[in-house]
Structures are given as structure tokens and as C-alpha cells.
Amino acid sequence: MKKIDSWLTKHGLKNRLTLVVIVIFIIFLILLFMFVNLSDEDTGQITITENAELRTGPNAAYPVIYKIEKGESFKKIDRKGKWIEVQNHAGTEKGWVAGWHTNLNIPADQSLSSNPLKGKTIVLDPGHGGSDQGASSSTPSKSLEKNYTLKTAKELKKLLNKEGAHVKMTRSNDKYVSLDDRNIKGDAFISIHNDALDSSNANGVTVYWFKDKQETLAQTLNSAIQKKALLTNRGSRQQNYQVLRQTDIPAVLLELGYISNPTDESMINDQLHRQVVEQAIVDGLKQYFSS
């Protein structure tokens, strides 16, 4: 006690009450500073700092619900990694936004600034081949599925190589390859097909997956193709195909139009349209590996 009195006297403080007041004042300043700098994350509200997308899940592989603009605010519901689940103030819409598009000071993923396909091994599986011609058209051109799956795969391979990806082909010419022999390892497996039905009315693109780990890739590619291709979008669907069942890597089977539909067939035959679809597949893969 004498030491405290001596310290108070030395610093011109006549009583302990003055010291208590100073301590309380310092604590008040600290609390005030903390309150002023309280982030909106703690208050349950976030603000969008740059134009972004509201998605159905916590990474860029999920489909976009709608575009959101800089300055909009949302109620924060949850957080997974660098992604924030939000709800609009009306309570009518929920979705996920990347945290680096908000005022929460979350750094962007480093992978977004580099080429996400560089060094990735992509397996391309042109359906059918050799004695297995696949589907065929009923038009005078008599288009064969096996020919166009191979053309698409070769053209897609060039685009992927430009992105720094290593591409493996289950076949690179018109030969028969068993389904068992198509089980090649990589970072992603893309089986390329054209659909067909007895009715010429069926049309469009379908993306198939089987295992749960394949669904995100399917949704991502379906969304990317939908943005660019002129073909009708039939969505992503679960189907027990052997090439999907037998692999342990992310895999999809793409039905890129109905060769039995004259309109779809003309687009399948058109190199420019194939290039649009192929670029959409590349975009989807880049988005998938950026997530």
C-alpha cells in the first residue's frame, strides 16, 4: 500500500480514486475502439464490395442464382471456408457469395490468379469407335456418332493443351475400345457422346454423373455449356453408366446433342458450333479446378 501511495504522490495523484478513474477510462477507450472496429461479420450483415454472383453452394462450381452488385447488403447466415451463405433482407432468396467480394477482408484464392488447368491430367473418352458406330442419323448425311465424338475430343484436346493441361485419350483413331479399357486415371474424366431416340423431336445436351463426387463437376460443366451452346439444356442427371461407375476420379458423360434430331445434327456437324461447346467445357473445367 505504501508503494502505491508513493507512486501516486510521485506522479501527482493524491488518492487511489484518481487511479481507478484512469483505469476505467482506459478500459472504456479500449471497448470503444473495439466497438467502432466491429466488423459486419459479427453483426450478421455483409456488404458487397464488387460485382459478384450469388451461387447455390459454397464454391465457384455451383450454378449462379443471379448477379449481385457492389453496394448491396445481405444478412450473413453461415460460412464455409472463404464462402459466405447470405440471405436478402426480404428473406426470399438465399445463396453463397465468395468472401473476397465482401467487406469481410477475406483474401481471394491464390488459384484464381493462376491457370487452374496447368498440370492437370484430363482424360477424354470419345464414345464408341471401330465396329461400334454408336448412334446414327436418319438424314441423307448418315452421320455416325463415333466420328463426331472423336472429332470433338481431338479439338477439345488442343484447347486443353493450350491451357497447360495434360490430356489422355481413350482412343485417338477409329478403333474399338472396351469399356473396361477406358478406365484411365487422371484428375477428371470426360466421356463424349451424342444421343439418339426413335423420335426426331428429342434434342439438347445432357450431362450425366453417377457417384456423389461427380455431381459437382457435372453441375459445373452443365452450367458452362448452358451459357454458350445453342442446344437445348436438359440439365445434369444421375445415371449408372459403366464408365462413370468404374472410375474413382471426378467423371461425367456428355451427351452433346441428339444426332437423331435434324437441327441438333446440323450443329454437331458444324465445326464452329463444336468449338463453342468445346470452349464451354474448358471454361467449366477451369471453374471446377478453381474452386
From Swiss-Prot:
Coiled coil stretches, renumbered: none
Chief location: secreted
Domain SH3b intervals: 41-105
Region forming the signal peptide: 1-40
Location in or out of the cell: Secreted
Keyword check for Zinc: no
Region (Disordered): 123-147
GO cellular component: extracellular region; outer membrane-bounded periplasmic space
Compositional bias ranges of the Polar residues kind: 133-142
SUPFAM superfamilies per UniProt: Zn-dependent exopeptidases
UniProt GO MF annotations: N-acetylmuramoyl-L-alanine amidase activity
Listed EC numbers: 3.5.1.-
Domain called MurNAc-LAA: residue spans: 122-286
Keywords, comma-separated and alphabetical: Cell wall biogenesis/degradation, Hydrolase, Secreted, Signal
Enzyme class: hydrolase
Any one of the GO BP annotations: cell wall organization
Alphabetized PANTHER family for the sequence: CELL WALL AMIDASE LYTH-RELATED, N-ACETYLMURAMOYL-L-ALANINE AMIDASE
Function: Probably involved in cell-wall metabolism.
Family of this protein: Belongs to the N-acetylmuramoyl-L-alanine amidase 3 family.
Record-given protein name: Probable cell wall amidase LytH
Species lineage: Bacteria, Bacillati, Bacillota, Bacilli, Bacillales
